Amino acid sequence: GGFTHIAFNSIALYFFGPVVERYLDTRRFTALFFGAGIVAGLAQVGSTLLTVGPFGPGVVGASGAIMGVLGVLTVLNPGLRVYLYFIIPMPLWVLTFGFAGFSIVAGFGAFGGGLAGGNVAHLAHLAGLVIGLAYGARVKGNVGVPNSQEFGRGGGGMGGPGGPGGPGRGP
């Protein structure tokens, strides 16, 4: 938890969100984001109630929503080149499943914090990812995915700066 966690969520949404929104559309992106966040948050709250009781840490679900976005993008464009920490190049699927593996080990492994996860909602991450992967598989044949994607412009979503209809671009 904490500021660093919020910062990484914000960075991920800034870079991945507009790309997924372009693939889906604003309405479906919004439904995915809130749906994955709500389901992920409920999964984490349920597991916390079962393992720690009613006095466990609270959860917002934003990480699950971000992982849902990442899951959809991984299904739609698994080979998309991304940069871990803005330095290490890798295909998106490696980043996604590497992060999922980390959440499994940190949340459930011998050195992890259990389902409470040391104030990180690891089950929410995983639940959001599963929702995103499933939704991506469902819409894969119905959305246009370009062979290559100009990536890293962030904020270029529908109507945003650099996006279709946004400032600096034609309609």
What do the predicted segments below correspond to?
Residues G1-P171:
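A detector for small-residue-rich transmembrane helices and their helix-helix packing motifs
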